[in-house]
């Protein structure tokens, strides 16, 4: 049997989970709250094969630089934030809002590659 997988990226600011924005105003609120501050991105990964299941999580601290309303609205109007937890994607223009990342960059993207490879090894699958 093959392996099934599930990934879930979540963004937390001061213990509050920031989901996907409902609209542009919600995206602006989230990005304004994140601007100039540290937040945490957590990604949960579950692998399944038959009856066997393995779940792990990875956390990474992300520091946003200060950003003004006009700059944030320009980003929002591009559409990138609307389908992303925390209203940004580090792999796109959202990278311009990030000042520093402490931890796994790929986790911030939503796929902690090293964690996934270690989990796959527990199922006997090696990537290198």
Regions inferred by a protein language model and the residue ranges of each:
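Anionic-ligand binding patches
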Residues: 1, 5, 9-128
């Amino acid at each position: 049997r093959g392996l099934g997988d599930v990934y879930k990226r979540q963004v937390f600011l001061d213990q509050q989970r920031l989901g996907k924005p409902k609209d542009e105003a919600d995206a602006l609120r989230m990005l304004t709250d994140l601007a100039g501050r540290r937040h945490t991105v957590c990604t949960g990964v579950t692998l399944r094969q038959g009856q066997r299941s393995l779940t792990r999580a990875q956390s990474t601290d992300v520091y946003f630089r200060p950003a003004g309303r006009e700059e944030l609205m320009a980003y929002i109007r591009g559409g990138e934030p609307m389908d992303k937890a925390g209203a940004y994607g580090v792999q796109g223009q959202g990278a311009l809002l990030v000042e520093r990342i402490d931890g796994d960059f790929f986790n911030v993207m939503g796929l902690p590659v090293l964690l996934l490879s270690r989990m796959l090894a527990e199922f006997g699958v090696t990537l290198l």
